[in-house]
Amino acid sequence: MSETSNKKLKITQYRSIIGCSKKQKATIKCLGLGRPNYSRVLNDNPLLQGQLRVVQHLVKVEEVSE
């Protein structure tokens, strides 16, 4: 079937959600962020890629080696 990826991504929020749509605010909350300069390390998957596409102007994404 499909190969599972062990790739991890560090997601850092660098812009505030003030003035953003409800969908973008909810996506930031689902990612576990909430304020500028908060970071999370999450496993890469298609769901995460879709969420990042919604808030690409608010976050920075870096690949992390384990």
UniProtKB/Swiss-Prot annotation:
<dbReference type="InterPro" id="IPR016082">
    <property type="entry name" value="Ribosomal_uL30_ferredoxin-like"/>
</dbReference>
<comment type="subunit">
    <text>Part of the 50S ribosomal subunit.</text>
</comment>
<keyword id="KW-0689">Ribosomal protein</keyword>
<dbReference type="GO" id="GO:0006412">
    <property type="term" value="P:translation"/>
</dbReference>
<dbReference type="InterPro" id="IPR005996">
    <property type="entry name" value="Ribosomal_uL30_bac-type"/>
</dbReference>
<dbReference type="Pfam" id="PF00327">
    <property type="entry name" value="Ribosomal_L30"/>
</dbReference>
<comment type="similarity">
    <text>Belongs to the universal ribosomal protein uL30 family.</text>
</comment>
<dbReference type="GO" id="GO:0022625">
    <property type="term" value="C:cytosolic large ribosomal subunit"/>
</dbReference>
<dbReference type="InterPro" id="IPR036919">
    <property type="entry name" value="Ribo_uL30_ferredoxin-like_sf"/>
</dbReference>
<protein>
    <recommendedName>
        <fullName>Large ribosomal subunit protein uL30</fullName>
    </recommendedName>
</protein>
<dbReference type="GO" id="GO:0003735">
    <property type="term" value="F:structural constituent of ribosome"/>
</dbReference>
<keyword id="KW-0687">Ribonucleoprotein</keyword>
